[in-house]
Amino acid sequence: MTRVVRVMSYNIRYGGVGKETELATVIQAVAPDIVLLQEATHPHVIARLADTAGYPHYGSRRGQSTGFMSRLPVASHAWHLPRGARHPFLEVAVVEPEMRLFGLHLSAWFSKWSERRRHFEIRALLEGIKEHQHGFHLLLGDFNALAPGEVLDVVHFPQWIRAMVWLSGRDIARDTIQTMLDANYADVWRRFNADDPGYTFPTWNPHLRLDYAFVPMKYAERVKSFEIVQAPPIVKTASDHHPILVTLD
């Protein structure tokens, strides 16, 4: 890799409808080279956002959760739907520096049933990208999952979600993120922040880390920083997720 590249992952909530100006303000303030989006379900919104924020290359598809915007030339992009998954994952092949980015949005909710689905989805994704696992690549997005050792504080949840957690045995398995670690991927946030909880959701009262970036362990040294975007202040109302930013060298 011959240049510094900054990659953002951002869940824009409800397709970003009516929030284009706020989202563009956040993205322009951070100025990433590439943005991977979740809940990017309205192509016309993504086109408008890309134009406003200054990204000539972009892709989204109606009904698909994942999309992207890029200032770097893109050789190709495609959506792949593993069997049984709720959302397709997005593959973006960047021309220079050569790398692949995989954007994903796993099933939501906190219950043993939804965690089983996420676990299935991530195993299917890893199987699907096997042919690329020897080259440099990143997996980023809204995993909707807890990492091993992280605390689930249900006091912040609505009553109906508390009930789901209670029915699941009063806690949630950590299989999804553990699968990534077992596959020899580095949890980028934890690489730089051993003790900081790294909460990304919700923006008005952060108490969950749902947004992750993973890199193959053998390429971990190429990642120079990981930031949870806290500014400009409008980030608190633009979406319910804080964006995350990974800097590569």
Regions flagged by a language model, labelled:
Residues M1-T52:
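N-terminal, active-site-proximal structural segment of metallo-dependent hydrolase catalytic domains
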Residues V4-R13, E98-A108, L140, H241:
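Active-site-proximal beta-strand elements of phosphoester/diester hydrolases
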Residues R13, T41, H105-S107, F143-L146, ...:
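Catalytic metal-binding/acid-base residues of hydrolase active sites
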Residues I34, Q38-R116, F120:
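Structured beta-strand-rich core segments of catalytic domains in phosphoester-bond hydrolases
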Residues V35-Q38, L138-D142, A186-R191:
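Active-site neighborhood of phospho(di)ester-bond hydrolases with catalytic His/Asp-centered motifs
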Residues P43, P56-S70, R83-R86, E115, ...:
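Active site of divalent-metal-dependent phosphoester/diester hydrolases
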Residues M69-L72, E91-P97, V215-M217, T237-S239, ...:
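Active-site beta-strand termini and strand-to-loop segments that position acidic
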Residues H119-N144:
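His/acidic metal-ligating clusters that form di-metal
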